[in-house]
Each structure stands twice: as structure tokens, then as C-alpha cells.
């Protein structure tokens, strides 16, 4: 089942409050994903379909943890709201570059706008780790070095657990 929460709205599911927040990037649908006749005309016209506004999410868990999921975004003054209204203690920040924040921009958003206690690096569009370690020279490493708070790296088979203050009980 799907539950609709439009941009700016909130819903509660299973005790978790989910708010939709602004993300900033284009959000087109490539004609290859559309019906044949429509796709043909769109390709000929050089246009893509509009998939609606980009969004991020703020989750408030039953243990009190507030987590910000950036979605694909660029730097925006709206990131201030994540700190001032929602007071997020954990962030999952996409750092893909090219069509989202790169490492420097993502670090700015975290250090100067959102200011969480911890951040999880996400969606870097690269193999950011090898054998469980951050790859030297990667975007993931650049973000980790620039961020002023602990950056947790998601690894296959590893579970991370955060308390209400955004502190990870992770074995690093």
C-alpha cells in the first residue's frame, strides 16, 4: 500500500512521523520510459517528462531520533529549516555530484546548515569503499574529511543503530 504525503505534508506510519521537505534538482523522466508513441514525439522534440518536485524526508522515530534524508539535492536555503524546525540529529546526505551536491557542497549543507550530530554518506555514484575501507581519493573520502561531524559509511552486512541524540552505537 502507498500513502501519499505531498511536499510540505507529513504522515505517520507505524509510529514514525514522515515529513516531506524540499530537495533541489531537476526531476525529468527520460522518454525511453514512456509509451512508444509519446516517447517518439518527446524524443523528436528533445524533451523529457516532468516527474514532479524533488523531495527529501524528515523521519521522527519512536525513540526520539530525528533523521533527515536529503534525497538528490543541491545546496538550498531550505536546508536551514531541517535544523531550525525539525532539529535533525542524523542526516543521510547524497553526495553524487553532477546532478546533486558534490562532497564540498554536501559538507557545507551538513556543517553550516543542517548541523546534525552524525551523517551517513550516501549515493556517491562511485565505489566509495573497498574491503570495508573508504577508497583514497574518492568523493566519499573528500566528504568525510570536510564534514565536521562523524561520517558513517554504509557497508554491506553492517547494521548501524542511532540513539535519539544521533549518536551511533556502531562498531567502526
Where do the PLM segments sit?
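Divalent metal-coordination and catalytic microenvironments
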Residues: 18, 72, 91, 119, ...
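Binuclear metal-ion centers of metallo-dependent hydrolases, dominated by the metallo-beta-lactamase
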Residues: 2-10, 107-172
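Core dinuclear metal-dependent hydrolase active-site scaffold
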Residues: 5-84, 156-172
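Alpha-helical scaffolding within the catalytic cores
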Residues: 75-79, 102-109
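Catalytic metal-binding/acid-base residues of hydrolase active sites
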Residues: 24, 74, 96-98, 125
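Active-site metal-binding motif and surrounding structural segment of the metallo-beta-lactamase
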Residues: 1-4, 84-92
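Acidic-and-aromatic substrate-binding clefts and catalytic sites of carbohydrate-active enzymes
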Residues: 97-102, 128-131
Amino acid at each position: 500500500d502507498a500513502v501519499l504525503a505531498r511536499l510540505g505534508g507529513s504522515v505517520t506510519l507505524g509510529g514514525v512521523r514522515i515529513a516531506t521537505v524540499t530537495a533541489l534538482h531537476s526531476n525529468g523522466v527520460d522518454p525511453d520510459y514512456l509509451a512508444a508513441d509519446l516517447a517518439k514525439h518527446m524524443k523528436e522534440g528533445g524533451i523529457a517528462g516532468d516527474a514532479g518536485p524533488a523531495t527529501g524526508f524528515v523521519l521522527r522515530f519512536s525513540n526520539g531520533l530525528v533523521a533527515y534524508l536529503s534525497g538528490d539535492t543541491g545546496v538550498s536555503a531550505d536546508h536551514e529549516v531541517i535544523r531550525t524546525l525539525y532539529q535533525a540529529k542524523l542526516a543521510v546526505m547524497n553526495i553524487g555530484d553532477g546532478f546533486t551536491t558534490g562532497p564540498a557542497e554536501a559538507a557545507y549543507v551538513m556543517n553550516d546548515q543542517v548541523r546534525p550530530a552524525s551523517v551517513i554518506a550516501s549515493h556517491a555514484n562511485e565505489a566509495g569503499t573497498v574491503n570495508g575501507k573508504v577508497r583514497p581519493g574518492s568523493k566519499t573520502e573528500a566528504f568525510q574529511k570536510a564534514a565536521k561531524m562523524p561520517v558513517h559509511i554504509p557497508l554491506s552486512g553492517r547494521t548501524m543503530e542511532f540513539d535519539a541524540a544521533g549518536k551511533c552505537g556502531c562498531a567502526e
